Amino acid sequence: MRILKSHPLLKIVNSYMIDSPQPANISYLWNFGSLLALCLGIQIVTGVTLAMHYTPSVLEAFNSVEHIMRDVNNGWLVRYLHANTASAFFFLVYLHIGRGLYYGSYKSPRTLTWAIGTVILIVMMATAFLGYVLPYGQMSLWGATVITNLMSAIPWIGQDIVEFIWGGFSVNNATLNRFFALHFLLPFVLAALALMHLIAMHDTVGSGNPLGISGNYDRLPFAPYFIFKDLVTIFIFFIVLSIFVFFMPNALGDSENYVMANPMQTPPAIVPEWYLLPFYAILRSIPNKLLGVIAMFSAILALMVMPITDLSKLRGVQFRPLSKVAFYIFVANFLVLMQIGAKHVETPFIELGQISTVLYFAHFFVIVPVVSLIENSLVELATKK
Amino acid sequence: MLARTVLRSVPFRGVARQSLNKTSTRASSSAAGAESASSPFHLTLTASAATAVALGSAAYLYGQEAFAMTPAEEGLHPTAYPWEHAKWNKTFDHQALRRGFQVYREVCASCHSLTRVPWRSFVGVMHTVDEMKAMAEENEYDTEPNDQGEIEKRPGKLSDYIPAPYKNEEAARAANGGALPPDLSLIVKGRHGGCNYIFSLLTGYPDEPPAGATVGAGMNFNPYFPGTAIAMGRVLFDGVVEYEDGTPATTSQMAKDVVEFLNWAAEPEMDDRKKMGVKAITLLTGLFAISVWVKRYKWSPIKTRKIVYSPPVSRR
């Protein structure tokens, strides 16, 4: 037997990336997985390199980042890659989730894969937030202050928890140190979760496909067909990433973070990075602090109910026009929330944010189940003569 | 709209009537199906309204800006100038950088530090080694403690950083009426509007504050500064610097040169970055083209295959 099939480790590689039979009809929307793995790889390599030159101290963090930018050979390249790949990571993960919602990837038998995916999203957000604090500019400090203060909404023990997270009475040196330690650790947790995500899919039925039917009628081996297909999008990704890194590296960042953190001066507006804005908007739409925090976390966890609330007998929305409309409304609403998250809290953005928040949750808990039941009926009526 | 068209194609009343009868068999997975499925028209309406709200609010949001502060507190938005060095295929104008550094040294440096820029970084960018060595030696720096533990003075070296005008923040505030002149090393990256903002600020001082504007004692009016009252007065006047290359030193010329210089101070890697970017994009475009070719080469048999169904033939 070929060593690829008999060797205890190589045969795993073989069964995942070489012989692994994939549905012949999966479109380019099934390429996001490999791109996300690439993003994680880039982040770990650039991140570990940055850690070799970074100093996690409130006095030296900002200076050490500038040292990386100015004195370390190609340090600017490493740091800009790290900062912009973080954005790319979220851009792709949102597309990946959108693909899952559109084609019903969450439905049984892939519920475990979907659940692990939701956990991955949460860990990704935590990692991104921790990483944003590390350069210790103005937005790092004040973003950290705002987000850690969310925990104070927990009844009775909230303030104690916040001080436990801080390791003091405000964001301080201990906070920065532990954020650095956790930011170093979490990507490896992410890698493990990504592996679980892959195993959960591989050991059930593998990838779905755009038709929402069994993929067993026509499969092709991963190599060479899908390796070369993935390679096409990998190069597109590298081109887009290069445009950002080399020509507009700070386009997605906030200029406030090039000002050294100053606990005595609050910036005029505290805005998270673009990829967290929809959830920030949901947080700010709820007038009550505790309920706002709950709503924000529920907004992510709401993804987990999709396998339960989608009652459709068909997988995916491609043959369900009503659900298609609902899906695109959901996407538009997500983009609206992203805009509202960057606005100042004032009329009319408060009201619009509240409407969008209601619509966001309604999609998961009302629109999807109701629309899927209607479509079930229509299909049944059409097929039963 | 789409939803309505879709539903119109379905016979409504028949759907409603039949679905009521079939509820028990159809919606076995949920009890909520009965009443919701019975009124698809309402849902069409809801869906259409939701689409309208989503699209409408998106258009509304993208269409306008919100200001939590008054225009005066926000500061006038700077004009977008066509900066030559900001274009993707352009480098810094190194003669402009040299002039800008002269403006910094002769005008800005009396109040503003540039602490992240060492003398060595000018070498090969806008000055020769000998020029920079001479410039560094004009300044005194502390030595390491000698055998007796005394700290002495020595002339500057290339590896030293540009000295700050004040010993510490308190000294700077004391000399400037309580205001702290910010360090300029990252000023272009650290301000909204970047080059445009700095240029507008430097050239935007009116001769007198406009009618109705009040400026506190020791403050100056500048519409581009958030809050409009800035401690720094107008510093650039025609001819305040005499350029060594003979360029007429108008206010706007000096402002343009010093902004470009400060942009270099904030992003000294910009020229290298763009050059590397052109190489990367060229290389990756080539690789992308090859990858498309290989993908099509590998897939063409699959894409052009013919699937034939041969019904079983009974052999008897």
UniProtKB/Swiss-Prot annotation, chain A:
A single GO molecular function term of this UniProt record: metal ion binding
Cofactor: record remark: Binds 2 heme b groups non-covalently.
Residues engaged in binding a ubiquinone: H202
Membrane topology of the entry: Multi-pass membrane protein
Keyword Transmembrane found: yes
TM helices/strands, residue ranges: 32-52, 76-98, 113-133, 179-199, 226-246, 290-310, 322-342, 349-369
Entry keyword Membrane: yes
Alphabetized CDD domains for the sequence: cytochrome_b_C (cd00290), Cytochrome_b_N (cd00284)
One record GO biological process: mitochondrial electron transport, ubiquinol to cytochrome c
Signal sequence coordinates: none
Pfam families xrefs: Cytochrom_B_C, Cytochrome_B
Cofactor(s) of this protein: heme b
Compartment(s) where it occurs, according to its Swiss-Prot or TrEMBL record: Mitochondrion inner membrane
Primary location group: mitochondrion
Residues where heme b b562 binds: H82, H183
Function text: Component of the ubiquinol-cytochrome c reductase complex (complex III or cytochrome b-c1 complex) that is part of the mitochondrial respiratory chain. The b-c1 complex mediates electron transfer from ubiquinol to cytochrome c. Contributes to the generation of a proton gradient across the mitochondrial membrane that is then used for ATP synthesis.
Note from the entry: Heme 1 (or BL or b562) is low-potential and absorbs at about 562 nm, and heme 2 (or BH or b566) is high-potential and absorbs at about 566 nm.
Membership in a protein family: Belongs to the cytochrome b family.
Protein's UniProt name: Cytochrome b
Gene field: cob
